[in-house]
Amino acid sequence: MPAVACYVDTSAAVYGGAGALSLPASEINFSGVPPTTTSTTVNQPPPPQQWSPSLSAELYRIDRWGPPYFAVNSSGNVTVKPFGDATLPHQEIDLLKVVKKVSDSKSSSGLGLHLPVIIRFPDVLKHRLESLQSAFDFAVRTHGYGSHYQGVYPVKCNQDRYIVEDIVEFGSGFRFGLEAGSKPELLMAMSSLCKGSPDSLLVCNGFKDAEYISLAIIGRKLGLNTVIVIEQEEEVDMAIELSRKMGIRPVVGVRAKLRTKHSGHFGSTSGEKGKFGLTTTQILRVVRKLENFGMLDCLQLLHFHIGSQIPTTTLLSDGVAEASQVYCELTRLGAHMRVIDIGGGLGIDYDGSKSGDSDLSVGYTLEEYASAVVGTVMSVCDRKGVKSPVICSESVRAIVSHHSILVFEAVSSSSSASPPMPGSTLALDYLVDGLTDEVKGEYRSLTAAAMRGEYESCLMYSGMLKQRCVELFKDGCLGMEQLAAVDGLCELVSKALGVADGVCTYNVNLSVFTSIPDFWGIGQLFPIMPIHRLDQQPKARGILSDLTCDSDGKIDKFIGDESSLPLHELSGGEGYYLGMFLGGAYEEALGGVHNLFGGPSVVRVQQSDGPQSYAVTRAVPGPSSSDVLRVMHHEPELMFQTLKHRAEECDNDYTAGPLADMLAQSFNSTPYLVPGHATGSCGFSNGSGLVNGCREYFYGVDDGCNAAAVDAAAGEEEQWSYVCA
C-alpha cells in the first residue's frame, strides 16, 4: 500500500448537488460546550504569549540535544556552531541560507542541487575528534596515568572517502587511526593511512579469510601499524601460517567475550553468547598456539565491546574492569601486551534527556566517560603490577553523528479534519433524500441529540450513521457523492465536539529506507524539526510520510515519546524544510534503494570569514534515475534506445524527437520529486540523449566568502562543475 496517504478532501469539490454538509449554526450547537442557562461572569483566558525562537527551541528540545553545535537564531532559523562553545557569533552558520544556496537554480546564483541533501560540516567533525582526544588527555593527566589514549575510527559506520580522509588528516597529530571489518574496508584504510601518522593503529576486526590476513600482514611491510584481531579461533592458525610463509612477523590481538552485558537494544551482541569474540578457554588456546610457534610476543592487543550507547559509567566501569583483568592475565602468561581496545559504546544524547535509562540518551558527559575508563584501567593494572596500556576506543557515534544533517522538504499535507464544504440545508436535504428510512432515523436522532446538547449521544449516532451508510454503499444503494457527504457530516460533528484527530500527514520528499534506515529497522529515533519559521508558532501536529510505496515508509515516533511532531502549515509557493540531526553514523552506510530512490545530494560546508560565514567546498548531486537503475544491473542506455525505437514506431500527436527528449530527461533526472516545473538533471551529455556519470564534484563559494578556503579544501584535485540538462 502506498505510504503517501491519500485522503478524500471534502473541501476539494462540490459533489453533484451535494452542496455543503454543515448544520445551521443557529439551530444546532456543536460547540462541545452546553449552552449556559444562567448569567455568570466568565473569566477570560489571558492573552496568548507572543511566540519566539526560544519557545521553539524548547518545544523541539534543541536546547537539550543541540548544544554545543545547534541552536535557533533570532531570525527563527536553525544555526550551526562549527566550533562548539568556542564559536563566535559571526561564525555561526544559518542552515536555511545553506539550503537556499544549495537548492536555488544556478541562474539564481545557487548550485541547482535537488533535495533531499546531506550537509556535512567538517569543522564540527574536527571539533568532535579534538574534544574526544582532549577528554582522554585530561583524564590521563588527572589520574596520573602512565600511558596515553589513541583512538580509531571504524569506517563501517560511514565509508565516505572524504569523511575518512578528514579523520585521518584531523587526527594525525594525535595518532588517530582506523578500524576495518572487511577486505574492501581494509584496502581503504591502508590507502588512507598512508597520509596519516605511522604510529596510527589500523585495527583489523571482523571475520577473516587468508586474503584478509595476508593484506593485514602486507600492511606491516608497508609501514602501517596493522593489528590482526583474532575473532574466531581458526584465524590464529591462518595468521601463523601466512606470516611464516611471507617472512613478516604480525601484530595480533584477541577479542574477548566478556561476562559484562549491556541490557539495552545495542547490547544484544554482548555477553558470553555474543556474536563476536573468544571465550576464556578459546583465548587460552590461542595463547598456547602462539607460544608453541615462538610468536607469543606478537600478541599485543586486547579488544572487547560491551555494546553501543552504553547508558551509564557504572556499566562501563564493570566491563572495563573485567577486560583489564583479562589484559593483566595475558601479560602474566607472557604476551607482550601493549594496547587495550575498549571498542565502541560512547553514547550520544539523541533526545536531550541525559538519562541512563534509555537507548536514546546517556547519563554521563564525554569527560566523565573518559575519566571512568582511564581510572578503571589504571586501578586494575596498578593492583596487578602491570604497566599501563595504551587505551584505544572505537567511539564512532561520538565522532561523526553531529557533523551531518539531512535536510528534506515537506511537499504537501493532508489533514484528517478537513473544513466543511460551503453551503447549508440544501446539502442536508440532498443527503436525507438518498437514505433509507432506517438510516434517516439515525440522522434524525443525531440532530435531536445535538439540539438537546447530548454530545456523547451525538458521537454515537454519528458513528452509527456512518456505519449504515458504508453498508449501503457496499450494497450499491448509495452513491459516492452521498458517502463523501456523510463523511463530511460526521467529520464536522467530531470537530465541533473537539474529538477529531488533529494529526496531519505531511508528505516529505524522502525515502525512509534510504536515508533513515535505522528508524525503520530498529526504531531508532533522531531529532527532527523544521529548520526555519521557528519565530512562528506551529499550529499543526503531523507525522511524516515518505515517497515510497510501502506502509512502513513513515515517521510516526519522535523524541520525547511523541507520536506526532509540531509543524507549521504549508505556505503556497514557499518550501518547508525539515532537518534530521545526529544521523552522521551508519545511516548512509545502511541505506538501500527501495523503490529505486537513491541517496541524497551531499554538500560539504566550512566556516568562512566572508559575510555569509560559510563556504560550500564540495557538492555531489544525488544519483539520477539512470544511476540507481545501474545499481540493479539494468542498462539505461539500452532501455532508452528501446523506448526511443518504440516512440518512432508509434503513430501519435508527438514527433519522435520530443518524445525521445522527454525520455532522456526522465532517465537523467533525480528519482525524487522536483518542485515547480523544472525537471533539470545533473550530468554530462554524451550526445545520445543520456547523461553519463552524474557524480562529479563542484567547488563553490558563497558570495563574498573567502575563495582561499575553497582552494585549500580542493587541494590538488582538479576543480569540476556540473551542468543541468
Curated annotation (Swiss-Prot):
EC annotation from Swiss-Prot or TrEMBL: 4.1.1.19
Keywords carried by this UniProt record: Decarboxylase, Lyase, Magnesium, Putrescine biosynthesis, Pyridoxal phosphate, Spermidine biosynthesis
One GO-annotated biological process of the protein: arginine catabolic process
Keyword Lyase annotated: yes
Alphabetized InterPro entries for the sequence: Ala_racemase/Decarboxylase_C (IPR009006), Arg_decrbxlase (IPR002985), De-COase2_CS (IPR022657), De-COase2_N (IPR022644), De-COase2_pyr-phos_BS (IPR022653), Orn/DAP/Arg_de-COase (IPR000183), PLP-binding_barrel (IPR029066)
Pathway(s) this gene product operates in, as recorded in its UniProt entry: Amine and polyamine biosynthesis; agmatine biosynthesis; agmatine from L-arginine: step 1/1
Superkingdom of the source species: Eukaryota
Organism: Dianthus caryophyllus (Carnation)
Any matching Pfam family: Orn_Arg_deC_N
Entry binding sites for substrate: I340, D341, I342, G343, G344, G345, L346, G347, I348, D349, Y350
Cofactor(s) needed: pyridoxal 5'-phosphate; Mg(2+)
Reactions the enzyme catalyzes: L-arginine + H(+) = agmatine + CO2
The family this protein is said to belong to: Belongs to the Orn/Lys/Arg decarboxylase class-II family. SpeA subfamily.
Protein name per UniProt: Arginine decarboxylase
Modified residues (N6-(pyridoxal phosphate)lysine): K156
GO molecular function: arginine decarboxylase activity
